[in-house]
């Protein structure tokens, strides 16, 4: 039997396949297949993106365990602060090893 504390699925979870089908039936405008990934990569400003990505994590650093940040204790605050990723700051995908693909309905089936 299921636990009484289990959250029932939401409307969106129950209708995921229908929502996905409706999305593809609407024929959304997508990027052309001949887009050069290197051009897209060069226009990406990694330093701006890195700042916006790290800012929520900085909010938790050193916030203390007195309940000032909701239900976190000081151990979780230290853990959250320690996951800030600075190894790729400002580099984007410099190696070019990540291949961009266009999401199509056939890939999902």
Curated annotation (Swiss-Prot):
The keyword Repeat applies. It is found in: Nucleus; Cytoplasm, Perinuclear region. Residues 69-97 have a biased composition (Low complexity). GO terms for cellular component: nucleus; perinuclear region of cytoplasm. It comes from the Eukaryota. Keywords: Biological rhythms, Cytoplasm, Nucleus, Phosphoprotein, Repeat. This is Period circadian protein.
């Amino acid at each position: 039997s299921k636990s009484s504390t289990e959250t029932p699925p939401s409307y969106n979870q129950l209708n995921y396949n229908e929502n996905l089908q409706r999305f593809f039936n609407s024929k959304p405008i997508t990027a052309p297949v001949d887009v050069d990934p290197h051009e897209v990569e060069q226009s990406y400003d990694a330093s701006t993106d890195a700042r916006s990505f790290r800012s929520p994590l900085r909010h938790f650093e050193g916030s203390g365990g007195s309940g000032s940040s909701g239900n976190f204790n000081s151990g979780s605050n230290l853990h959250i602060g320690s996951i800030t990723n600075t190894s790729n700051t400002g580099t984007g995908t410099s190696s070019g090893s990540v291949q961009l693909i266009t999401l199509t309905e056939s890939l999902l089936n």
